[in-house]
């Protein structure tokens, strides 16, 4: 396919003095922050689905974008044209990673055999594109939610044949991810939930999910895939209630089926807020549980109750999230993937670049602000001081199992304990954070 973004040059860093909307003002891939480059810290990725599989349609109207590769025609030819445009975009954006679902990159076909054959051919195409451009795959996944067969889920479907079809897709998607050097494999249970309890057997569906995830783990080890397996939590939409509601729920599920050492989580900002949590809360919770894996960077609209997948633009939110990540040692195989889509009125080809450039710049600012908080360590010092008692004789004794309820009660009476509350100084810390963010 002819060059689609022919009037757009490769995006470069020009600094804060630049007013060029097609240049980075803050994201400088090789700039060192805490001894590591921005590129290594952030591990940025762009997604295939919103950028190249969506024409701007919504439930109230037809598509608003000019996407020639989505027009009617030979499905495989259109898929190859889509790959041409996608890798042109990724390369010009100067982003190091990308992510995909199986049917983003390959026609599903009219049978499972067609699906397998088409996907194998397109994996060849993607492999060649990666070699040509130097782009890497952050993660792959299988779409087990769009086709009508998955109306009641895949792993949680009441029909074992649907379960089987979904398992087949996951096997081939994981195989392709391994072949393409993917660093993670994601499972998002968009339809793994229920619409009504009137026709749902919760225990049965949970057992099915547990078996499905065990099969995924078995296949990972069978083929020697070294990447992380990631579950992406979301509370609802498209189902009324999803079984991977939030990070804590996922942890409980994994513990029940002995999988807590096999999976991490891929946290999406908009999913966190839909679950009634802050983005920072979900990241901090995942880290505290040993589940942190990767991030889908986006944002929701506070006035809307659905997944808007807008580009991240809150430096405060991003700084606090990156602070949590840096405290924990940074990403291993994960990164920041832009699971984001343009507003359907943003129909100029430049808009796709401008939106991603903004997101990359905001993450770069957040990284630098988070690094300042790490270096100043005022938050770390405040937390250490607040919990200092647990490093004393009593605190260590309690946590070390030296006391039971009766012996603690006796100690409390014998020493006539009258503990006093000490200020948490929330407002002081909020002011200090704002001083870092805004000066």
From Swiss-Prot:
**InterPro entries in the record:** Xyl_isomerase-like_sf (IPR036237), Xylose_isom_bac (IPR013452), Xylose_isomerase (IPR001998)
- Per UniProt, where does Mg(2+) 1 bind? 232, 268, 296, 339
Give the enzyme's EC designation. 5.3.1.5
Residues that bind Mg(2+) 2, according to the entry?
A: 268, 271, 307, 309
Could you tell me which Gene3D superfamilies the record lists for this protein?
Divalent-metal-dependent TIM barrel enzymes
Subcellular location(s) of the protein: Cytoplasm
> Which cofactors, by name?
Mg(2+)
Q: Where is the active site?
A: 101, 104
Gene Ontology MF, one: magnesium ion binding
| Reaction it catalyzes | alpha-D-xylose = alpha-D-xylulofuranose
Which keywords belong to this entry?
Carbohydrate metabolism, Cytoplasm, Isomerase, Magnesium, Metal-binding, Xylose metabolism
Q: Alphabetically, which GO biological process terms does the record hold?
A: D-xylose metabolic process
Cofactor binding note of this UniProt entry: Binds 2 magnesium ions per subunit.
Q: Output the superkingdom of the source species.
A: Bacteria
Q: Which GO terms describe its cellular component?
A: cytoplasm
Family per UniProt?
A: Belongs to the xylose isomerase family.
- Quaternary structure note: Homotetramer.
Q: Check the record and name the HAMAP family matching this protein.
A: Xylose_isom_A (MF_00455)
Please identify the protein, giving its name as recorded: Xylose isomerase
Question: What organism does the record attribute this protein to?
Answer: Pseudoalteromonas atlantica (strain T6c / ATCC BAA-1087)
Q: What is the lineage of its organism?
A: Bacteria, Pseudomonadati, Pseudomonadota, Gammaproteobacteria, Alteromonadales
Gene name, Swiss-Prot/TrEMBL: xylA
């Amino acid at each position: 396919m002819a060059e689609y973004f022919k009037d757009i040059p490769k995006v470069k860093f020009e600094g804060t003095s630049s007013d060029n909307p097609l240049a980075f003002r803050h994201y400088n891939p090789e700039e060192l922050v805490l001894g590591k480059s921005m590129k290594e810290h952030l591990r940025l990725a762009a997604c295939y689905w919103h950028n190249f599989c969506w024409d701007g349609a919504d439930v109230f109207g037809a598509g608003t974008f000019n996407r020639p590769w989505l027009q009617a025609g030979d499905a495989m030819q259109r898929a190859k044209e889509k790959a041409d445009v996608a890798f042109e975009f990724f390369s010009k954006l100067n982003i190091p990673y990308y992510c995909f679902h199986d049917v983003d990159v390959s026609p599903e076909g009219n049978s499972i055999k067609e699906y397998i054959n088409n996907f194998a051919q397109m994996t060849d195409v993607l492999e060649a594109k990666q070699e040509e451009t130097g782009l890497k795959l952050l993660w792959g996944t299988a779409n087990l939610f769009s086709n009508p067969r998955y109306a009641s889920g895949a792993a949680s479907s009441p029909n074992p044949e649907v379960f089987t079809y979904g398992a087949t897709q996951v096997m081939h998607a994981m195989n392709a991810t391994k072949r393409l050097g993917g660093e993670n494999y994601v499972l998002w249970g968009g339809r793994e939930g229920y619409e009504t309890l009137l026709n749902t057997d919760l225990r049965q569906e949970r057992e099915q999910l547990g078996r499905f995830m065990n099969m995924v783990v078995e296949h990972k080890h069978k083929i020697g895939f070294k990447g992380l397996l990631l579950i992406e939590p979301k509370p609802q939409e498209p189902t009324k209630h999803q079984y991977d509601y939030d990070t804590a729920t996922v942890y409980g599920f994994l513990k029940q089926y002995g999988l807590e050492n096999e999976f991490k989580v891929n946290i999406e900002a908009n999913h966190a807020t839909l679950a009634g949590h802050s983005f920072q809360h979900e990241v901090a919770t995942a880290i505290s549980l040993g589940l942190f894996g990767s991030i889908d960077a986006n944002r929701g609209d506070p006035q809307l109750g659905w997944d808007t997948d807008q580009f991240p633009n809150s430096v405060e939110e991003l700084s606090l999230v990156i602070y949590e990540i840096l405290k924990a040692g940074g990403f291993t195989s994960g990164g920041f993937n832009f699971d984001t889509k343009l507003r359907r009125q943003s129909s100029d080809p430049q808009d796709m670049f401008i939106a991603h450039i903004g997101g990359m710049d905001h993450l770069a600012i957040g990284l630098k602000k988070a690094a300042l908080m790490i270096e100043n360590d005022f938050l770390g010092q405040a937390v250490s001081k607040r919990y200092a008692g647990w490093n004393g004789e009593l605190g260590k004794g309690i946590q070390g199992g030296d006391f039971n309820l009766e012996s603690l009660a006796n100690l409390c009476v014998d020493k006539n304990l009258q503990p006093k509350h000490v200020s948490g100084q929330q407002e002081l810390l909020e002011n200090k954070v704002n001083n870092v963010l805004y000066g």
